[in-house]
């Protein structure tokens, strides 16, 4: 099987490439020119440097000829800060490439696509009462992304969206997206306790994501499929204990679960900061507490069905946090996301 990826040199794409190559498949990826310093990629993976947003339709078609599966392992999430209008930013990186590549896929006969999506789209299905897609522009963009995938899917072109939760693990030379968490919680270090929402989240490691992507490439899908993915469900208080341990702090620091209205009071500072810096947030800070007070958990059966195996999630969290702290403190020269996951 020949697989063409966008984002194969990113944290998640490179893990998928490793798994696919180990399974005997051929992998080629389109990558932005800047590669993380020291990162290792499978020598069997062919890397083509370029920007999908600057390629012609003919160039895209040439890349897709003879390909069995297209994997979109690129894009940006809600933790990437961007200027207004945020809707245009998300469209450029998360949706527009799919519209162009899917059209080319159908013209040259590619039969399947696997897209790395977000579990926030899954949230809108299990908790429509939260109205997350109307209150948060990032979540709306992920719902629109799935709509585009569904519109292109048919009996001759299958599309599988992997609704991914929070992911932990590191890639040498690349800046983790978790630096934003360090910024958010550092001010509470001086207190004898930490106030945080009562909810929790699904999660998995980057290695497990690679396994799931490879499994989705191999699985026989028909039409459109959206699959919620997660291997572990963790409450926020337990998660923060692991974070504190990674930061060299006492993991037994008391963590007090607070209601949404109380967290909203703390978000006023974030709103003012965004406004001062001209940043448009894809997630409404004043509405986020309602999501974080919910246990956004996922049954791991879907990930296991696609080949995910056990991993050490606590170690992956600790690795992510240690590198994030180094980046936040300016002690490491790391490459940002650049639209690749």
Whereabouts are the PLM-identified features?
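NAD(P)H-binding glycine-rich loop region in Rossmannoid oxidoreductase-like domains
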Residues: 46-96, 100
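Conserved Rossmann-fold NAD(P)-dependent oxidoreductase catalytic core, especially the SDR/UDP-sugar
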Residues: 96-140, 160
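N-terminal Rossmann NAD(P)H-binding glycine-rich loop of SDR-like oxidoreductase domains
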Residues: 3-23
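Amphipathic terminal alpha-helices
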Residues: 294-341
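Terminal hydrophobic/aromatic helix or amphipathic segment near a protein terminus
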Residues: 240-296
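A conserved pocket-lining segment of Rossmann-fold NAD(P)-dependent short-chain dehydrogenase/reductase
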Residues: 183-204
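Conserved beta-loop-beta element that borders a ligand/cofactor-binding pocket
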Residues: 148-173
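Glycine/proline-rich active-site loop of Rossmann-fold NAD(P)-dependent oxidoreductases
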Residues: 169-182, 216-227, 249-251
């Amino acid at each position: 099987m020949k697989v063409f990826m966008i984002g194969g040199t990113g944290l998640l794409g490179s893990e998928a490439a490793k798994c696919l190559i180990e399974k005997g498949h051929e992998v080629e990826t389109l990558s932005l020119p800047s590669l993380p310093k020291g990162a290792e990629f499978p020598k069997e993976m062919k890397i083509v440097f370029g920007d999908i947003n600057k390629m012609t339709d003919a160039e895209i078609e040439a890349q897709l000829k003879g390909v069995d599966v297209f994997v979109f392992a690129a894009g940006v999430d809600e933790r990437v800060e961007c200027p207004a209008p945020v809707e245009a930013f998300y469209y450029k990186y998360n949706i527009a490439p799919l519209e162009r590549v899917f059209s080319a896929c159908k013209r040259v006969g590619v039969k399947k696509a696997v897209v790395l999506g977000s579990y926030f789209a899954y949230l809108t299905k299990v908790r429509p009462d939260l109205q997350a897609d109307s209150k948060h522009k990032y979540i709306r963009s992920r719902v629109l992304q799935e709509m585009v995938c569904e519109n292109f899917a048919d009996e001759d072109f299958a599309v599988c969206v992997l609704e991914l939760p929070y992911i932990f693990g590191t890639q040498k030379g690349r800046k983790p997206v978790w630096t934003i968490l360090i910024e958010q919680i550092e001010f509470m270090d001086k207190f004898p306790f930490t106030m945080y929402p009562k909810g929790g989240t699904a999660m998995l490691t980057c290695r497990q994501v690679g396994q799931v992507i490879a499994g989705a490439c191999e699985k026989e899908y028909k039409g459109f499929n959206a699959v919620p993915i997660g291997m572990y469900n963790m409450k926020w208080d337990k998660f923060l204990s692991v974070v504190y341990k990674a930061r060299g702090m006492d993991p037994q620091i008391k963590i007090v679960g607070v209601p949404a209205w109380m967290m909203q009071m703390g978000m006023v500072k974030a709103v003012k900061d965004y406004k001062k810096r001209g940043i448009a947030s894809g997630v409404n800070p004043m509405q986020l507490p309602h999501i974080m007070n919910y246990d956004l958990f996922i049954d791991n059966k879907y990930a296991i069905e696609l080949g995910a195996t056990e991993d050490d999630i606590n170690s992956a969290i600790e690795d992510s946090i240690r590198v994030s702290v180094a980046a936040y403190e300016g002690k490491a020269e790391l490459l940002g996301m650049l639209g690749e996951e």
